Amino acid sequence: MDEITTILDSTRPVSDIISDLKEKSVDVPEWSKSLKDYDPSRHKIVTDKFSRKDKIRSDGRVEPASRIHLGLEKLLVKRITEFAFAIPVRRVYHNTEENKKRQQITKAIEAIYKYARIDSENIRRGNAYFASCEIFTIWYVVERPNTLYGFNSKYKLKCKTYSPMDGVRLYPLFDEWGDMIAMSFEYKKKIKDKEVTFFETYTADRHYKWKQQGEASWIAVTDPERIILKKIPGVYAYRPAPIFHGLEHIREEIEYTLSRNSDVIAYNSAPLLKVTGELVGDEDKGEARRLFRLKNGGDIAYVSWTQAIEALKYHVDTLLKLFFMQAQMPDLSFENMKSLGNIGFDARQMILSDAHLKIGDESGAWIEFFERECNVIKEFLKMMNTSWADEIDNIEVEHVITPFIQNDEDALINRCMKGNGGKAIFSQLESIKMAGYSSDPEKSLDQIQKEDKAAQQARINSVFNEGSE
């Protein structure tokens, strides 16, 4: 009897089964700890009462200390996700040449990705993966007759991603060879104003679902559901640390530096009046012309406060540079971008080379994830269209992650034309469609051809008229 069969033995108490399934096979940081760095409102400076003490006035009023918190970790997660997936992942299909059935299958796979909104799903998965360190995407079918995939299908294929960011605890279970034998997850759901905890497990042939009753009692929601795919209908990915690991001390130093300086500015921003000599009488407030009288050549003036701002600016700028340098991500703030001016495509590539290397470093785990996900989709497609079952596995799918860069279309087109011997790389109809201005490109092309023909005829007539004179 294998390990997972032993764990899921129906004669065992459900609480023991779930306890064994919660024995996580991988070491992933607790999201509750990473959240303290990811969420700016949970940073140390927000609750620090030791080094950031509030001032209590003599009248009992509390003057709160400045607490400036920065969401640099959240920004870093968004930025690396955007660099990885702002340009949608491209799929290249091999071994489909001169085989119409395989070409139809590739179109069906692309349609599955399209109607599952995979591009926006990748953005969500990227944010969750780089911040909370693990994701699990489950694929499932809903009964909905359609022709979205190029054939009459009774079902529509959809996907849903779970991660600790959504309050879901993931429990993958691997065997000694590193193959996943079970995937479990625990989540809470409100039912009639009561929060109920559910625990689900997927194996290669069964789907189990339990709900919690009381503190340690569990009951089955339904009988185990058979999985006809003969494999877990989902994919799991994890990383050993969040993308911002080791950078929190830099962000913390920036927060404390700015907060301390904010207190200094607040203290010294009120006008300070300097009086030299003895003041005679009182100055009446509210008068249009204010008069101060002083004895023995006295003087009165406002004292201007001078702050050594350059040292502070240098310190904060250096820390910001260190933060993004160690993260291997560029600081794409508006201030930095406007100083670059109108640089060429090659210069942009050079500037972003470190970020592209970082995406290349991270892409290995993603490519593996996408390949396993594609295999799950293929298995579903075999069931949805049995006439394709013998050909689906013959198609090879290559996933290409393109790091973000602003393209120079003129340079790209000129380079492609040069490689094409100086000839056009788009037909007239294709260029009209790409421009996007015409609501009916075919009609526009027909009109352009008519106008060209009329102009050519006018030139011919002009030549003959000049000759007859």
What are these regions (language model features)?
Residues K101-A108, K114-N122, Y129, G246, ...:
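Short amphipathic alpha-helical segments
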Residues Q103-I109, G298-Y302, L352:
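A short, surface-exposed helix-loop junction/capping segment
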Residues V28, R42, I87, Y115-I123, ...:
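Short secondary-structure junctions and interdomain/linker hinges
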Residues L279-D284, R289-G298, A311, T318, ...:
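C-terminal helix-loop subdomains that flank or include functional centers
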Residues M1-Y155, F464, S468-E469:
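Extended, helix-rich architectural segments
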Residues I123-G126, F130-A131, F136-A237:
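Extended, regular secondary-structure scaffolds
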Residues S217-M350:
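Extended, charged amphipathic alpha-helical segments
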Residues K78-A86, A128-I135, H245-D263, K433:
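Short, hydrophobic/amphipathic alpha-helical patches that form generic packing surfaces
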